[in-house]
Amino acid sequence: MKAFLLDTVTVSEFRKIGRIHPAVDQWQHRHLGDEMWISVVTPLEIRKGVHLVRQKDPVFAAELDEWLINIILPGFQHRMLGIDISTALQAAEYRAIHGLSPNDSLIGATAKVHGLTLATRNSADFQATGIQLVNPWEYSL
């Protein structure tokens, strides 16, 4: 059994019921029995998106917030990893040496510290870090 840390872009893709990218859908079904984790940064990024889109599209913002509160938070309640000192120090390295954004640094460091494979569409952003990566958008049977 494998264990994955889902990047926010991957979690967001799962929301697209009926419109999910075919490769991501295949990857998700292939790994149904595997452990899927998220970082506390993912709800932060989703909630930030809610606030940013609220002015333009209040209906979508409300749907996104409802999905966060009713699906993501309870669904990952026991599979959401926080930021401890080891994660913070690793994130500092990724930020300083590899130029990752603050959020990507924290997500990448969480994967590294917990020995998880990071499932992300943005694998090129993390390539130089040595983190184990998988791009579900490139999955094929």
Predicted regions and their residues:
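Active-site neighborhoods of divalent-metal-dependent phosphate/nucleic-acid chemistry enzymes
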Residues: 48-51, 74-121
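Short, well-structured N-terminal submotif of metal-dependent ribonuclease cores
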Residues: 1-38, 52-68, 140-141
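General small-molecule cofactor/ligand-binding pocket signal
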Residues: 37, 81, 134
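A generic structural signal for short hydrophobic patches within well-formed alpha-helices
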Residues: 11, 43-46, 88, 126
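A secondary-structure boundary/capping signal
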Residues: 7-8, 42, 122
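Acidic, PIN/NYN-like endoribonuclease modules and their adjacent C-terminal/linker elements
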Residues: 1, 108, 113-141
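Short, flexible helix/strand-to-coil boundary loops that buttress conserved ligand/catalytic motifs
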Residues: 15-18, 50, 95, 130
